[in-house]
Amino acid sequence: LANLCYSRRVPCYMISSREENEERRETNNSRLMQWFGAHVIPCEKSQIAQTVRETMEMLSAKGYRPYYIYGNQYGTGNEGVPVQAYVDAYEEICTYEAEQRIHFEYIFFPSGTGATQSGLISGHLLRKDQRKIMGVLISSREKERAEQVIWQGIQDYFQKREIPLTPVSQEEIHLLCQYKAGGYGKYNQEIIRVIKEEFCRNGIPMDPTYTGKAFWGMKEYLREKKIADSQILFIHTGGTPLFYDCLGNEEV
């Protein structure tokens, strides 16, 4: 987002929250933010809403018309907006399947804010096809809250397009919460092992916060459920700068 704002000459402000007493350190992402000229506003996690409100008021007083990508100060209201991006991605997947004459029975990916999962499930519901959309939760959210956010995104998307949903539609939310490894940004040595293995074998960079954790979770799930001989797609959602942060970590 900061990159796009820079290219369009739109001022970018980022509210950067952290846990109490959490040490703030420089990362490749933070260095890129500096390159893009983004204004980073730190705050405690308990003060996000207040900081968003104060920042919006400050920018309005300067004559700007600020837009908060999550909606209101509490982060609600825009759940349906990013969904279209992954509805489009779902269509690309279906096109690829038709060209290659294959069908993915499972689609796995990291699930954090819920936007990716809302979009993929929406595309799946519109297509009315048969498969399981499997989000691997990488945040510290509780399962009930995480599923609520995903469902809200789906509802917003369908309501704005005046397309009916049925209660059965909610049953298409498959969220794996048992592979969080302690919560957001935390990981174990098994996750690191999987990251090393995938990079050395296939040249694919993953990170322990998002893609690496989700890929590990997917492999664990497939092993535990004894799923074999199935067509499976894993969506790499980005995060390459975090891979290089991982390389510089003395624990790796």
Question: What would you call each of these model-derived segments?
Answer:
Residues 10-54:
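A glycine-rich helix N-cap at a beta->alpha junction
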Residues 83-174, 236-252:
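Glycine-rich phosphate/pyrophosphate-binding loop at beta-loop-alpha junctions
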Residues 1-11, 121-128, 217-226:
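Alpha-helix C-terminal capping segments
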Residues 169-229:
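Active-site-adjacent helical/loop segments in soluble small-molecule enzymes
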Residues 15-16, 43, 68-72, 110-111, ...:
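Short beta-strand segments
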Residues 55-88, 93:
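Phosphate/diphosphate-binding glycine-rich loops and adjacent basic-rich segments that engage nucleotide
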Residues 1, 7, 113-120, 212-215, ...:
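Short glycine/serine/threonine-rich phosphate/pyrophosphate-binding segments
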